[in-house]
Design a protein with these regions (language model features):
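Conserved active-site-proximal phosphate/metal-binding subdomains
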Residues: 2-120
Length: 120
């Protein structure tokens, strides 16, 4: 929820992915880190999960390799090799300052609790 907030350390490409169509396509993969985790499907995941891809090394070898590859790709302007972790709720992300997001979530929770109380 907080990654798109300006206070987060997420880079612009990660924020854009979370707020765009990429957030609608997540997958559980070992490709990025060597451990199962859910991320937005990008070039790295697509290549790593292709049928002819080599086996993924265990953590931390896979994660260290991904980080090095991502640094090199970013240096050439390619954001498709980043670990862009995201859960199934990623499409619900909203870009706003963290304080505003907390206030919005608090108000939404209060509204949902009131609606629930009205039907129970």
């Amino acid at each position: 929820a907080f990654l798109p907030c300006p206070e987060s350390a997420a880079d612009d490409a990660y924020r854009a992915a979370l707020l765009g169509d990429a957030a609608r396509t997540t997958t559980l993969t070992k490709v990025i880190s060597g451990r199962p985790a859910r991320g937005m499907v990008n070039e790295f995941i697509t290549l790593g999960e292709s049928p002819d891809a080599p086996p993924v090394p265990d953590f931390p070898i896979a994660y260290d390799a991904e980080r090095a590859l991502n640094r090199a790709a970013k240096a050439s302007g390619d954001a498709g090799y980043a670990a862009q972790w995201a859960g199934q709720g990623a499409p619900l992300s909203r870009a706003m300052p963290a304080a505003n997001l907390v206030a919005t979530l608090r108000a939404e929770l209060a509204g949902a609790a009131a609606r629930l109380a009205a039907i129970v």
